[in-house]
């Protein structure tokens, strides 16, 4: 049995089974290597979307940097075998400046670069990240950082936008109207998870504070907003406000819809509210879809 010098890293590697590279016969330079993806012949079908998923990259949401999880895709004609996936990352890097800004205009430019680099007509992106924002306690007005989850969706064909979506998921407090009605005192309440997917008008300019307007519709219609910091006067106010504004999941999604339907820059929306019931072993939920 061969003895290896275990005092060296290379010796320890070989002791655990590593071997020396062989002298191969295949090309080692890019220009000499076969590019299978670029093979051209009849491959029977066009592909609507092909690309990468779960690409984690730094993003900028307003003034905060966070991690974004991307899915990128392009179309593929039937006479091409595949796409060069490394060009997707190269396209992203051309727009990277301490993070990719999560705004529709920036994502549009990334997709235009992707179209050019991939030599395809259609391109799309979906990216999810954490949105951080300043939140003040309701009575003492103490500032802290709140958060919600956002997902941007954008697709283009040529220079035309074919899909423009924003999804926000936020948590709220809901107090049970039935519990309040039948009880001599108190009422059960719980955390509710509200998800709103909006379909944004592709031909109309969107308002500057669109995220805040959607989030306000989600939170203001609940029994109470959630806060990072609550002192005793704040806790008293939050508790009393929830009691003053009882909400079933059905109530909440209808009230949110009543606000969203007034936004002329939306073509429609999907709403779901899921209550993590505090007195049951199950959750309660409601869903609503609306198209103008």
From Swiss-Prot:
Site annotation May be catalytically important: residues: 176
Metabolic or biological pathway, per its Swiss-Prot or TrEMBL entry: Cofactor biosynthesis; 7,8-dihydroneopterin triphosphate biosynthesis; 7,8-dihydroneopterin triphosphate from GTP: step 1/1
Reaction catalysed by this enzyme: GTP + H2O = 7,8-dihydroneopterin 3'-triphosphate + formate + H(+)
E.C. number(s) listed in UniProt: 3.5.4.16
GO terms (BP aspect): tetrahydrofolate biosynthetic process
GO molecular function terms listed in the Swiss-Prot or TrEMBL record: GTP cyclohydrolase activity; GTP cyclohydrolase I activity
Superkingdom per UniProt: Bacteria
Pfam families in UniProt: GCHY-1
Keywords: Hydrolase
Enzyme class of the recorded protein, top EC level: hydrolase
Family: Belongs to the GTP cyclohydrolase IV family.
Described purpose of this protein according to its UniProt entry: Converts GTP to 7,8-dihydroneopterin triphosphate.
PANTHER family: GTP CYCLOHYDROLASE MPTA (PTHR36445:SF1)
Name the UniProt record assigns to this protein: GTP cyclohydrolase FolE2
Gene designation per UniProt: folE2
